[in-house]
Amino acid sequence: MLDFCASQPLTLGVELELMIVNRHDYNLTRGSDDLLRLIGREDHGFDIKPEITQGMIEIGTAIHTRTRAMLEELDAIRAVLVRAADTLNLGLAGGGAHPFQHWSEQRIYPKERYLLVSELYGYLAQQFTVYGQHIHIGCPDGDQAIRLAHFLARYIPHFIALSAASPYYQGVDTLFQSSRLTSVNAFPLSGTLPCVTDWAGFNDYFVRMQQLGIVASMKDFYWDVRPKPEYGTVEIRVCDTPLDLLTPVLLAAYAQMLARECMESGWQAIHSDNYLAYSYNRFQACRFGFEGLILNPADNGQVSLQQDLVTTLTRLEPQAAALGCEAERQQLLARALARDNPSRQLRTLYERSGSLNDLVRRQSAVWMRDAATL
């Protein structure tokens, strides 16, 4: 039985998974232990922890009501990380996947849960050396969380296109805007929330999955959007880790605007038909980004992802005004109109330099030093 811990509606938090690279050829390096040990000597009070393999580290923000404060906290967390990384001659970088690392060289971080995941999923755990941003949105109760999770599913392609930052993987151009999510797809408990309509229905589903021995906790679900009952949030999990500090905040603002629209609007029926085109739309966003096509099963309509995002952002103007994030809405709108995302920036840079090593060096400079945008 899962209890949903109520939280203040529309509060925000984000988690970012970061690459740890050496400063010789900018390949991944097993630096998380040394980095965490050195950071642990500071009384910083931030949420900084290991991830599933040793070339990764995760940071998380506190709870925020406004994105400006979130950006300030992310900047302070970065300062702690950069001091330690400089001391150890390590680099840190954003992006959804390291462009040329080889999964077989990655080592599982020696934490009980990660070792269990590795034992269960074998090489999939090593291949899970990919980097994402998770966005948490506060909900007052479990019923609202289920409703919001289903509501947000409609807009998942937007988050993918805006954040896409993994065009290169294992040394090749994947032709995808976001290749990271293909690594998630391999897990049997990935995908979408079941079509339950309230918290009681979700509890019944969860208990049954526990009884069957399929899951032990909510962490075993790798869904694109999932309730996080212990936090009192709904969590969006499809975004690649951005290259800079501003983009995570813009994505969080978009989630907050959508969540406010959902909570302010009347109840909308939840039907399995809403998910008929989900996988197709998700693929379009991963493969083509803003140039993808979005299908709407309700009217059999088809529209470009870019136009759908622009229409949605325009509609959200009242929500942005109420939340004090009109500047963020305008920046998102400008990016959508320009079809500008990290994958496009990464490809442009690689076309100029022809070096994936140099690409990661530039990614690290952007994240660690606020270097000029790629």
UniProtKB/Swiss-Prot annotation:
Keyword Nucleotide-binding: yes
Keywords of this entry: ATP-binding, Ligase, Nucleotide-binding
InterPro entries in the record: GCL_type2/YbdK_subfam, GCS2, Gln_synth/guanido_kin_cat_dom, YbdK
EC number(s) recorded for this UniProt protein: 6.3.2.2
Catalytic activity: L-cysteine + L-glutamate + ATP = gamma-L-glutamyl-L-cysteine + ADP + phosphate + H(+)
Pfam family name, one: GCS2
Record carries keyword ATP-binding: yes
Summary of the function given for this chain in its UniProt record: ATP-dependent carboxylate-amine ligase which exhibits weak glutamate--cysteine ligase activity.
Family assignment from sequence similarity: Belongs to the glutamate--cysteine ligase type 2 family. YbdK subfamily.
HAMAP family for the chain: Glu_cys_ligase_2
Record protein name field: Putative glutamate--cysteine ligase 2
